[in-house]
Swiss-Prot record:
Induction: Induced under cell wall stress, but not disulfide stress, and this induction requires the CssRS two-component system, which responds to both secretion stress and cell wall antibiotics. Phosphorylated CssR acts as an anti-repressor by antagonizing YuxN repression. InterPro entries: SpxO-like (IPR048179). Disruption phenotype: Deletion of the gene causes a decrease in the overall Spx levels, as well as a change in the dynamics of Spx accumulation. It comes from the Bacteria. It comes from Bacillus subtilis (strain 168). Inhibitor of Spx proteolytic control. Acts by interacting with SpxH/YjbH, which disrupts interaction between SpxH and Spx, and inhibits SpxH-enhanced proteolysis of Spx by ClpXP. Required for the stabilization of Spx and activation of Spx-regulated genes in response to cell wall stress. This is Anti-adapter protein SpxO. Interacts with SpxH.
Length: 54
């Protein structure tokens, strides 16, 4: 997980707020639906190993 930590510290240095989040399984199934949707939906990155990027 060191690569992930380095990437997160680089993002923090650029001023992107990164935090570890826990979300219910309902959100995971919604996320799959979003990926299957043809039109790109603009959302926060809330996808990367439970990290939230805003």
């Amino acid at each position: 997980m060191r690569e992930l930590d380095e990437m997160i510290s680089r993002l923090r240095n650029r001023g992107i707020k990164v935090e570890k989040v826990k979300y219910p399984k309902q959100t995971l199934s919604e996320k799959k639906w979003v990926h299957q949707c043809k039109q790109p939906l603009k959302t926060n990155y809330r996808d990367f190993n439970g990290y939230s990027f805003t």
